[in-house]
Every structure is written in structure tokens, then in C-alpha cells.
């Protein structure tokens, strides 16, 4: 993958959630909500406080989905990143 976000943007790969509940019920893909957390894969030159490899939580309706190397990523404005998971 070769993508460099511009300005105050970050490239995030969503973290896939489990496909079964604690009681063993399988959740079909069309019934799951998209995860609101992911791993930062690249950061723009104006981004502070977030670095590549950080796990972040982001706003539900933020960002733009893009496909790179057969994977789906999210390009987020840094204002849509709510926090870093430590």
C-alpha cells in the first residue's frame, strides 16, 4: 500500500469485530454495524497526537472509504478521531 494522507487526515483500517455473541449466536455480516475503531496506517503532515500503529476510536459518520490492495480503508479528518486506545 502506498498512500499518504494530506493535511490533517489519517488513514485507518477498521478493526473487525467478532462474528459470534458470547452465547455462541452467529451474527450475519448484513446485521452487523461497521466498527468505530481501527488501526492508523498513515498520517498526514499536519497531524499531531496520533501516529502510525495507534488504535483509535472515530465518529460514526466520519471519513471516506477507499480501496487499496484489495482492502478497505477509511480516510478521516483528525477532528473525526475521538481518541486513542492505550
From Swiss-Prot:
Gene3D superfamilies: GroES chaperonin (2.30.33.40). The keyword Cytoplasm applies. One of its GO terms (cellular component) is cytoplasm. One of its GO terms (molecular function) is ATP binding. It is found in: Cytoplasm. InterPro entries: Chaperonin_GroES, Chaperonin_GroES_sf, GroES-like_sf. Belongs to the GroES chaperonin family. Together with the chaperonin GroEL, plays an essential role in assisting protein folding. The GroEL-GroES system forms a nano-cage that allows encapsulation of the non-native substrate proteins and provides a physical environment optimized to promote and accelerate protein folding. GroES binds to the apical surface of the GroEL ring, thereby capping the opening of the GroEL channel. Heptamer of 7 subunits arranged in a ring. Interacts with the chaperonin GroEL. This is Co-chaperonin GroES. The lineage of its organism: Bacteria, Pseudomonadati, Campylobacterota, Epsilonproteobacteria, Campylobacterales. The gene is groES.
Amino acid at each position: 500500500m502506498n498512500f499518504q494522507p494530506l493535511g490533517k487526515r489519517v488513514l485507518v483500517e477498521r478493526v473487525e469485530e467478532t462474528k459470534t455473541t458470547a452465547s455462541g449466536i452467529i451474527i450475519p455480516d448484513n446485521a452487523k454495524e461497521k466498527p468505530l475503531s481501527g488501526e492508523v496506517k498513515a498520517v498526514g503532515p499536519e497531524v499531531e497526537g496520533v501516529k502510525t500503529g495507534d488504535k483509535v476510536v472515530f465518529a460514526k459518520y466520519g471519513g471516506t472509504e477507499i480501496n487499496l490492495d484489495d482492502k478497505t480503508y477509511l480516510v478521516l479528518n483528525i477532528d473525526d478521531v475521538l481518541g486513542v486506545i492505550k
